[in-house]
């Protein structure tokens, strides 16, 4: 399997905010203007909607994948972390790309604040709120772009 450091720093990455019902997806590149929310993928009883994920993968052809690592504020493990790590392993097996983890603490809060600002500016509507998961994924990608050395390898 590819190593964590194998993601080209100038390559395109897809980032994921993994939840129990939805997975936010964002794309980013160091050569572009940060990250952009691109999709919200539903998670069913038997796992994520792989058809939708395959479609996003084919559209963006990333060089690597960045999964949010949901640590608690005191660096403890939690069920959400096990889910995110399992999803990262599935991504690595399915797409044969390097997968890294990046601390996602407060990414959903930051995404909600961005959404509120964009809504106040008239750029978002209430019905766009379902895109919050994808906005959180964009925060995760931006964190990786800003400090790729802070990423950890998937166990």
Curated annotation (Swiss-Prot):
The keyword Protein transport does not apply. The keyword Cytoplasm applies. It is found in: Cytoplasm. GO terms for biological process: rRNA 5'-end processing. GO terms for molecular function: nuclease activity. Keywords: Cytoplasm, Hydrolase, Nuclease, Ribosome biogenesis. Pfam families: RuvX. It comes from the Bacteria. GO terms for cellular component: cytosol. Its EC number is 3.1.-.-. Could be a nuclease involved in processing of the 5'-end of pre-16S rRNA. Belongs to the YqgF nuclease family. This is Putative pre-16S rRNA nuclease.
